[in-house]
């Protein structure tokens, strides 16, 4: 039996967590669970987003199943997702979007996996208020982080017998930061001659995804673009509720739904787990 850590989260988080655990038990998954209340509600009750016991559990099990957590917009505490990704070096956010015959959409042949770098870019959250009318945000792209996410995308492609990896970037404008990411992509692509590779500017990718999603296989991208385009791919298959998300590091892994905490329907038991 494998023990996993479970975070119940906010809004619909507790009720869908209970439903998922019921499903896993009915399927006789060889798992035991250490369950914790975390998030904004826990912060209001006890002054901590995550109880220390929850950190201890994750550091022991190395495997986390997390439900949605509310993040204040424009104020308040930092995103708990970002905190967990950085604390445990969960550098690869992998989001597969695949058409489901049970859900009718205009796009029946979608099968796209997005590899999103998870620890840097604008999501490092380094913002400086120069004066009341000016704010600077720092975008960080490093060779180390770029190499590992790009190489992981190609290794996955080879292992899963996929055909193409596309680098998504904005190097036409961000010539140094995205330019570095793109140049590293081209270097690593040479190590995988059996896998087709190409690169596309992010705005063009958004247009092409809603016109010809069947032309995409695996996408690898810096943090911000990956967050946006993976949500777009969820729309192609029927919505965020159908898109799983894996946050993978060298030693730890976190699995979660992509959608939010939906406080407006919390407790109504109408959210599909």
Feature locations, PLM:
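Short, acidic/small-residue loops that bind anionic groups at enzyme active sites
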Residues: 86-99, 191-200, 242-257, 266
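N-terminal glycine-rich phosphate/adenylate-binding segment common to multiple enzyme folds
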Residues: 43-139, 224
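Glycine-rich phosphate/nucleotide-binding loop
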Residues: 40-42, 209-273
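N-terminal beta-loop-helix "entrance" segment that forms/cooperates
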Residues: 30-53, 209
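Solvent-exposed alpha-helices and their adjacent loops that cap or buttress functional pockets
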Residues: 56-58, 104-108, 158-159, 189-190, ...
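Glycine-rich phosphate/diphosphate-binding loop of Rossmann-like nucleotide-binding domains
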Residues: 4-26, 131-203, 215
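Buried hydrophobic positions in well-ordered alpha/beta secondary-structure cores of metabolic enzymes
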Residues: 10-13, 62, 115, 153, ...
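Short acidic loop-to-helix transition motifs that present clustered carboxylates
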Residues: 41, 200-207
